């Protein structure tokens, strides 16, 4: 049996490999911590009030903007207060993005990738009104028009991007009680989400139509201040992220080709663990593929959904691999047949598949619909918000349970190894050194796997919470740092890169010896190893089944013949 490179690589070469990979890991953390800005930035825009012509209320091509040639004449709050009807059905709340800085107009860059808008509403009632505490889950109907223009276009050349009349539900509290009016402040509500930030400038017009027969927006007194928070990915972070993907992609592809060629040179069919490794490498390659470069040229509103699908495939493959990886090293070979997914792991992997499919369906229900209507959100209704929050909580709990189960499996592996080590003293010294070295290397690799799993689960839970942080009632702010994101992403690549190297078949072949000559040869190996700093484990003969990927898995069948 030739074994794997993990078994046959000398101690010095293995130390050099591990040190090099650790340096790469440190570099990934430093790259995000020292050079990349925060992953996301935001700008807060206070809405401007404009008054529109009655004759053009239903004209969706008519757009009001607050800056540039032909801008609307702003309406002051005093003018609204003096009007007996508070200018009902005449006011348009205008948000123009991005805001200028230092008297200079700024524009969005395609490197910023996406744009999310959330709105905070304040409305007021006359203090003479009987309403003091507004009821919960107030239904607000909003006429939303989103437009864009590009750099170099005239100021008035706004083009309609999307239009919709949507309902949002508000939970409000009393903000201020004055002698003439009472103000109420409401929780933030999701407004729109763009999967591609392809244009330079964006304009949002909001109308709150009043309709007595349909009881539309009659429970509100009058809108006071509207604040839009526009969240975008930072362009500097995108550049660092894509640079990392561009560098890692060819390395992973190259090591996969090298690994699979070595497997096919053997006189056997690939083992289950080798299949899982190549599948895992394929999922990582799909994740590493820097498709985001295309969004710099072509508008791709489906990029967010595609990114979620790619990451979901990788998560499913990585979680499945860890279960198989731990299971294949249980050192329990009761069945004479080769391990298969269906025979040994279908129960474990079914839970992973069901969980990933559930998250995929949840993602399609929101971001899939947003391809047609960017104003849609599953958070808009009380029931939808509860379902979404339940999904996020269940996803976090499931990830934690998975990690605990993986810890249990690895603990069983370590316990089995400890039980089998009792047979080492009865072996020859050379064979005992052989297996002690393998056990030490294997334990180190399993601990690295556990650390990788812990960071992956932590990143997944934090990512799920960050997506829904605008819905938490306690104003919890969760910011994934660039160092954490680039570090975990680099860790995935380095970990899988190392597995593909260490579990590749070793092609060192040694002549098979009879048992009567083995003790003499073992003693010669011991003398030789004493004069050297490293032990080449591959010098030892083995009577293992040639279909096994590692001699460690056949440890239980070894017989001491000293």
UniProtKB/Swiss-Prot annotation:
A cellular-component GO term for this protein: neuromuscular junction
Entry's Gene Ontology molecular function annotations: Wnt-protein binding
Transmembrane segments: 14-34, 240-260, 271-291, 312-332, 345-365, 391-411, 442-462, 483-503
Membrane topology, as annotated: Multi-pass membrane protein
Keywords (A to Z) from UniProt: Cell membrane, Cell projection, Developmental protein, Endoplasmic reticulum, Endosome, Glycoprotein, Golgi apparatus, Membrane, Postsynaptic cell membrane, Segmentation polarity protein, Synapse, Transmembrane, Transmembrane helix, Wnt signaling pathway
Side of membrane Lumenal, spans: 35-239, 292-311, 366-390, 463-482
Region (Disordered) location: 539-562
Membrane-side (Cytoplasmic) residue stretches: 1-13, 261-270, 333-344, 412-441, 504-562
Keyword Glycosyltransferase (UniProt): no
Subunit structure: Interacts with wg; in the Golgi. Interacts with Vps35, a component of the retromer complex; wls stability is regulated by Vps35.
Protein role: A segment polarity gene required for wingless (wg)-dependent patterning processes, acting in both wg-sending cells and wg-target cells. In non-neuronal cells wls directs wg secretion. The wls traffic loop encompasses the Golgi, the cell surface, an endocytic compartment and a retrograde route leading back to the Golgi, and involves clathrin-mediated endocytosis and the retromer complex (a conserved protein complex consisting of Vps35 and Vps26). In neuronal cells (the larval motorneuron NMJ), the wg signal moves across the synapse via the release of wls-containing exosome-like vesicles.
UniProt family annotation: Belongs to the wntless family.
Name by which UniProt lists this protein: Protein wntless
Organism of provenance: Drosophila ananassae
């Amino acid at each position: 049996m030739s074994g794997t490179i993990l078994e046959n690589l000398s101690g010095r070469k293995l130390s050099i490999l591990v040190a090099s990979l650790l340096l790469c890991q440190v570099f990934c953390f430093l790259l995000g911590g020292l050079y990349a800005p925060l992953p996301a930035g935001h700008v807060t825009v206070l809405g401007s009030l404009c008054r529109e012509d009655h004759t053009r209320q239903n004209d969706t091509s008519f757009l009001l903007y607050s800056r540039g040639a032909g801008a609307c004449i702003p309406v002051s709050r005093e003018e609204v207060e003096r009007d007996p009807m508070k200018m009902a059905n005449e006011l348009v709340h205008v948000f123009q993005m991005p805001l200028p800085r230092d008297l200079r107009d700024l524009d969005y860059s395609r490197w910023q990738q996406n744009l999310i808008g959330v709105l905070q509403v304040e409305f007021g009632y006359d203090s003479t009104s009987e309403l003091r505490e507004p009821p919960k889950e107030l239904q607000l109907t909003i006429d939303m028009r989103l437009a864009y223009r590009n750099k170099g276009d005239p100021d008035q050349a706004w083009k309609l991007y999307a239009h919709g009349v949507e309902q949002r539900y508000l939970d409000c509290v009393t903000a201020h009680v004055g002698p003439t009016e009472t103000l109420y402040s409401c929780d933030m509500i999701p407004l729109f989400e763009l999967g591609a930030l392809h244009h330079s400038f964006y304009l949002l017009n909001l109308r709150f139509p009043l309709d007595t027969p349909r009881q539309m927006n009659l429970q509100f007194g009058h809108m006071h201040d509207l604040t839009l928070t526009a969240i975008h990915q930072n362009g500097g972070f995108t550049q660092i992220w894509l640079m990392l993907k561009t560098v890692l992609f060819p390395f992973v592809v190259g090591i996969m080709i090298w690994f699979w060629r070595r497997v096919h040179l053997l006189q056997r069919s690939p083992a289950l663990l080798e299949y899982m490794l190549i599948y895992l490498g394929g999922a990582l390659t799909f994740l590493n593929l820097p498709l985001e470069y295309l969004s710099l040229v072509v508008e791709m509103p489906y990029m967010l959904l595609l990114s979620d699908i790619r990451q979901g495939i990788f998560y499913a493959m990585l979680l499945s691999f860890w279960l198989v990886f731990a299971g294949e090293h249980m050192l329990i070979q009761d069945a004479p047949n080769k391990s298969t997914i269906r025979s040994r792991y279908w129960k474990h992997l079914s839970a992973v598949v069901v969980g990933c499919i559930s998250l995929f369906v949840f993602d399609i229900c929101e971001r899939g619909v947003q391809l047609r209507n960017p104003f849609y959100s599953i958070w808009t209704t009380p029931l939808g918000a509860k379902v979404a929050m339940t999904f996020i909580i269940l996803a976090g709990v499931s990830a934690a349970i998975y990690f605990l189960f993986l810890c249990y499996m690895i603990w069983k592996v370590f316990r089995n190894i400890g039980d089998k080590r009792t047979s080492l003293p009865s072996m020859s010294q050379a064979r005992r050194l052989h297996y002690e070295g393998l056990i030490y290397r294997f334990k180190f690799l399993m601990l690295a796997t556990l650390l990788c799993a812990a960071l992956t689960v932590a990143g997944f839970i934090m990512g799920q919470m960050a997506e829904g942080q605008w819905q938490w009632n306690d104003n919890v702010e969760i910011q994934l740092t660039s160092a954490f994101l680039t570090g975990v992403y680099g860790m995935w690549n380095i970990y899988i890169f190392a597995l593909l190297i260490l579990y590749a078949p070793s092609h060192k072949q040694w002549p098979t010896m009879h048992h009567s000559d083995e003790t003499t040869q073992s003693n010669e190996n011991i003398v030789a190893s004493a004069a050297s700093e490293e032990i080449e484990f591959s010098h030892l003969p083995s009577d293992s089944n040639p279909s096994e990927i590692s001699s460690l898995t056949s440890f239980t069948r070894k017989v001491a013949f000293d």
